A protein has these predicted regions:
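Phosphate/NTP-binding elements of NTP-utilizing enzymes
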Residues: 1-220
């Protein structure tokens, strides 16, 4: 029984292995759009995964970001690959939603880090988010090369200034950002030729931001 419990514990700290396998309830064949989104990363700097609630958008975003942070790409992966440790920035609407959604997907629940998408044995350390109970601002992740990747968690309500200054290899924006935040994300990846990943439900309708990713729906 102790052996089984230990195996279950270790399995819970490798959650990423449960997603997009060849077979099973989360097999890739059931998530064609997700996989197309991943593949497009090999050709396009900017991408947007639009979908309804509970369609797995945030899971897809956290999955790809984790692969880039760790460098542990599965054999089937035909999206973009980094061959070195990276700097990533992930952000959502508010500090609280970033904690409850992005942080939870990447790390797991507060006090149980390692049960999210980033494998527990690869989380080197985390830094707390000032003023946000149980919030995390920085995640240091062991990269397959032996180096360290860093993921910073921000929120749109911090304003454009919070996104300025640092070069980033990956920017992940979960839910539609203000345009000035999006532009700043592009600026942060300009010198690294990095990726800007958007995962969102178009709750505000066909805004200029959403329409920028829907060229077939542009008025003639």
């Amino acid at each position: 029984m102790e052996i089984h419990r230990e195996l279950d514990r270790l399995s819970s700290r490798r959650k990423i292995d449960d997603y997009y396998p060849d077979e099973g309830p989360h097999r890739r064949g059931l998530y064609v759009k997700h996989c197309e989104f991943f593949t497009l990363g090999s050709e396009h700097k900017e991408r947007c995964l639009l979908g309804g609630n509970r369609s797995g958008k945030t899971i897809a975003g956290s999955y790809e970001v984790t692969l880039h942070l760790t460098g542990e790409y599965p054999a089937w992966w035909n999206g973009y690959r980094f061959d070195r440790p990276i700097r990533a920035l992930a952000a959502g609407d508010t500090a609280k939603t970033s904690r409850d959604i992005i942080q939870q997907k990447l790390l797991g629940n507060p006090g149980d880090h390692g049960t999210g998408m980033i494998p527990g044995d690869l989380i080197l350390k985390t830094s707390p988010k000032s003023g946000i109970p149980d919030g995390v601002e920085m995640i240091h992740v062991k990269h397959v090369s032996g180096g360290t990747s860093i993921c910073q968690i921000n929120s749109y309500d911090q304003g454009r200034e919070a996104f300025q200054g640092t070069e980033q290899d990956v920017v992940w924006l979960d839910e539609e950002p203000p345009m000035e935040v999006y532009v700043e994300g592009l600026m942060r990846t300009m010198t690294t030729n990095g990726l800007v990943i958007n995962t969102l439900t178009p709750l505000r309708g066909l805004t200029p931001f959403v329409m920028a990713f829907l060229p077939d729906y542009q008025p003639q």
